[in-house]
């Protein structure tokens, strides 16, 4: 004899599985992103002494392990990242920006932002996201600045390091990028 509840139970189980599938996929994506971010931060701090020194004093570190930038006259860039306080991942973010002018090409890179105080960390949660260049002071580190930086001379709110550039496109900048927290 057939069980009259079987089709109903099967439909209920199917609906539950479909409802949970996006959450499982999101958790897997975030776990992969966190792993990529941890590896990128470890590589950066092991190869750049200034990044290593800042990581020890930073209130938090926001790292975007892979950002893709492309343009032909009009360009854009996008990537996802992780905010770490100590060794704990406390939030997931994305960064995006648009640009125009003389540009052509595509590239990938990553960047890490060492947030040195609570003011810098709070700016991430303010309003509808954080726009680079508006708010706390940011210093984008190059090789020369990195060699002269010490923990006693580090007085700015945020220090950013760009790393792992691949591809052909002149100029990588952070000015005008918007950083937004991803929903949990």
Predicted regions and their residues:
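Generic cytosolic/nucleocytoplasmic N-terminal low-complexity/intrinsically disordered segments
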Residues: 1-2, 42
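Structured alpha-helical
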Residues: 3-5, 20
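N-terminal export leaders
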Residues: 6-15
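Sec/Tat signal peptide C-region and signal peptidase I cleavage site
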Residues: 21-27
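Small-residue-enriched, tightly packed secondary-structure blocks
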Residues: 27-184
């Amino acid at each position: 004899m057939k069980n009259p509840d079987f089709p109903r139970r099967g439909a209920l189980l199917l609906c539950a599985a479909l409802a949970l599938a996006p959450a499982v996929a999101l958790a897997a994506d975030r776990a992969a992103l966190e792993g990529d971010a941890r590896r990128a931060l470890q590589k950066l701090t092991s190869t750049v002494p200034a990044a290593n020194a800042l990581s020890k004093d930073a209130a938090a570190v926001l790292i975007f392990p892979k950002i893709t930038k492309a343009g032909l006259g009009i360009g854009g860039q996008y990537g996802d990242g992780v905010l770490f306080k100590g060794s704990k991942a406390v939030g997931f973010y994305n960064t995006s920006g648009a640009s125009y002018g003389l540009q052509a090409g595509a590239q990938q890179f990553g960047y890490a932002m060492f947030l040195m105080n609570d003011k810098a960390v709070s700016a991430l949660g303010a309003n509808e996201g954080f726009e680079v260049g508006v708010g706390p002071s940011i210093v984008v580190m190059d090789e020369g600045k990195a060699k002269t930086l010490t923990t006693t001379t580090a007085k700015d709110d945020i220090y950013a390091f760009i790393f792992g550039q691949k591809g052909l496109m002149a100029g990588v900048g952070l000015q005008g990028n918007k950083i937004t927290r991803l929903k949990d």
